[in-house]
Amino acid sequence: MKKIVFFIFLSFIFYLSASESRFPISDENKELYSKVYDEAQYVLKKNHFNNELSFEKSDVVKKYINQIDNQKLIFTQNEINSYSIKPLFSSADEVNLAFILFNFFKERSLNLIDHQINTIQLIESEEDLISNDFVYKDRENLERFKSYSQIKSYQQKLIKSEFISIYLKENDIEKAKKKILKRLDNRKKSLNRISNDEIFSLYINSYTNFYDPHTNYMTPTSQEDWEINLKASLEGIGAILSSEDGITKIIRLIPGGPAEKSGLLKVTDKIVGVATSINEELVDVRDWRIDEVVKLIRGPKSTIVQLEVLPASSDNEDKGKLIEITRDVVKLEDAAAKKREITIQRSSRDYKIGIIELPTFYMDFEAYNKNRFDYKSSSRDVKRILRELDESNIDGLVLDLRGNGGGFLFEAYSLAKLFIGRGNVVQVMESNGSLQSLGHNLGKQNYDGPIVILVDKLSASASEILAGVIQDYDRGLVIGSQTFGKGTVQRMIELSHGHLKFTEQKYYRVSGESTQNKGVEPDISIPFVFNDEEIGERSYENSLPYNFIDPIFYRSFNKVENIELLKTTSSNRTSSNEMSAYIEAQQEFYENEKNNNELPLDVEKRRFMKIQREEKILTIENNFRSYLSLVPFQDYEEFVSSDPEEISDLREEIVLREAAEILVDSLQFNETPSRLSFGILSQ
């Protein structure tokens, strides 16, 4: 046994040497990347909020390998251990090893793809798709293989599993073979197109991500893309995308952007096909590089892009819904605050509730810097809306921050001033431990009536500051679900090549609590929210922890009494709503899908699984449609091609109305419902 291990070890030593000679990185590039790596290390050790962090160079290399081979399908455990044959004394040593390891990964991947192509070409009928074996949907938490022969054997099983999924959609062996062979060819092309900058970026970010998930290096190209997203200066759909195991996922919708306004996409949806226009053929983008998918989606203003979209819980090989979105530039006015009024009827009387929807904390910074008196901002727009609602004699206000991922920090405490007047809003701590409080010494409330802040898992950053200050001051109720949990501030600096974005501040509520990782806990939860564990700071590796510091002085308004009674009343109301059963059924289905990690390599078993899965989804959807008096779907294909906005909008409206109902409950349960007055000073 020792001889076998020793042989593997020597083989890898030989391969590393051979890789180094076959895939040389120029001395010029090695020197440049080493310099950039040194600069990044210096900046983070001196300025990052978590600058006392300590880890070994070997930890970075292991993280790098796990990043490029997270499914453990390329490197054996012995090969990973053997990197220690090269002592890492300098950044140049690390950069050199990063390229050697990547090119080992690349060459082995290309070799395995060739074996997979041979496996597919041997398939002639369903008889070749019968087996008692299985593969795993996700190998990230499993042990690595002990030998290359095990890897090769498993990769052949994987491609058969993928072929079965495609075949069950196509019902034609030759069509399925053509489709999967094209996909394998795309994988080879993607591997061959990876640049030196991207390889270096993968390695340096294996280092930066030890600090926290918001600290990362950007190549000149990725920096340009980041600025495009920030300024919305190129036409697209207004969505931030990421790639996970070859599948493009939506991680954020830009407020006011074409995708958000269409209502056809949501966070965690998967994009598996793109047609650059309505006249172009749909391109399967599974296993495409994220930058190439983005290039397909972008295009001239007012043109249409077609997307094939799958929900997060679906199988990656499902036939998705084809949607059309018109490309456009995200304009400030499209993301602006909007108002409306709704009426909540009670036996005693009708209550008029004002609604303000605030999708982001925006500000026309360019106009502000030019001292234009009419510059546009969220606080100015909300102030105007409050004046209009006050003239309508509303009984209370719901400020809807669902989906609001933040924006300008200045706007958070400008908005807080409208509701609390003078006072501290947030504490900001620097990496050196110095603390600064932000708020207003002067000013008065623009609205002193009852208020509810409505939040969800996508309410982040500035949204959490505002929700936190309303809660700490006992100014109103926070309702909905636990928020995202981003309580840090980042800074961007230029390096010799590319840029470094790093976390330099952490903010705290006036009560001393951090929103980092924990978010803001609502006073009253509304159950009509899908609990997706993939959303939130808590889902990120190495996210900074929650902690608390000393509180600072802040005023306390009259606290809303009878919170427990409000919870009970709301629970009684929502438990009888079919929406609760619908969400619970979706959640249960999603959890079962996630927990079942095995896929049989037998076409008949997989066909049965597919039928069962589609029937379950159809039952869940049609039960809810029956409750809504909507026509049920005839089959799964009709469901997939249906308009997701129909149910999504209804769910959002039900949650909003429940928030308004709770506000009216509080008005009825408390003796002084019309205005909440200033209370005593508390620390």
Where are the regions that the model predicts?
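Sec-dependent N-terminal signal peptides
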Residues: 4-13
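Polar, glycine-rich mid-to-C-terminal structural blocks
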Residues: 462, 474, 485-535
